[in-house]
Amino acid sequence: MSSIALGVNIDHIATLRNARNTEYPDLVEIANIAVNNGADFITVHLREDRRHIRDSDVFRLKDNLNVPLNLEIAAIDEMLAIAIAVQPECVCLVPEKRQELTTEGGLDVKNMFTYLMPFITQLHNHNIKVTLFVEPDINQINYAKKLSVDNIELHTGVYCNHNTQNELNRILEAAKHCYTNKIECHAGHGLDYQSAATIARVPYISALNIGHFLICEAVLHGIGTSIYKMKKVITNPL
């Protein structure tokens, strides 16, 4: 099988930093360690409440990375302006609720279609690729196709929480549907070594986004070691 890309989300490095409002750990330093150990791109989620990643983090990462920056944002005007100023290689549009601990599900592309169209057009006009974070649902992918997005990221959280064949089948079918419609397919949310190995075997998925689990593993084994192991797991799944 072809090599699958690993995106490392470093949001919770910022969570650790912000716990004491210090300047350490430094996100750029951590991002470079991630890249040196197999990360193909770096992902950060700039939330409306700035609970972890700050505006300045995004600009610093863009200026200091030698791999693509994948910026996750809510589809609101404030974030659009920041994305255009930063010029990340890719923006991933995600749903966002202030009270949630983490992103709880995919975008409802069907109901947001009219709103998303000019938003995506503006990003494309600034040569920024666009990903939509969606449930593994054929109907949602069909609407995403009409928006001419570059990528779909399939929400793997339900599969990771319940590990059912039915949910895995949904991911398989959604990835195949992306391929049929010439949309690059990524996946992420809740992945650990075991679930990432399974999802990495799904045909037509070209990249995985993994964050919280890797940061937790880093507490025990170090960030470099944890990312190196994950890259090995997903590129050589049994």
Curated annotation (Swiss-Prot):
One cellular-component annotation, GO: cytosol
Listed EC numbers: 2.6.99.2
Cross-referenced Gene3D superfamilies: Aldolase class I
Keywords: Cytoplasm, Pyridoxine biosynthesis, Transferase
Annotated compartments: Cytoplasm
Reaction catalysis annotation: 3-amino-2-oxopropyl phosphate + 1-deoxy-D-xylulose 5-phosphate = pyridoxine 5'-phosphate + phosphate + 2 H2O + H(+)
Main location: cytoplasm
Protein name from the UniProt record: Pyridoxine 5'-phosphate synthase
Organism annotation: Ehrlichia ruminantium (strain Welgevonden)
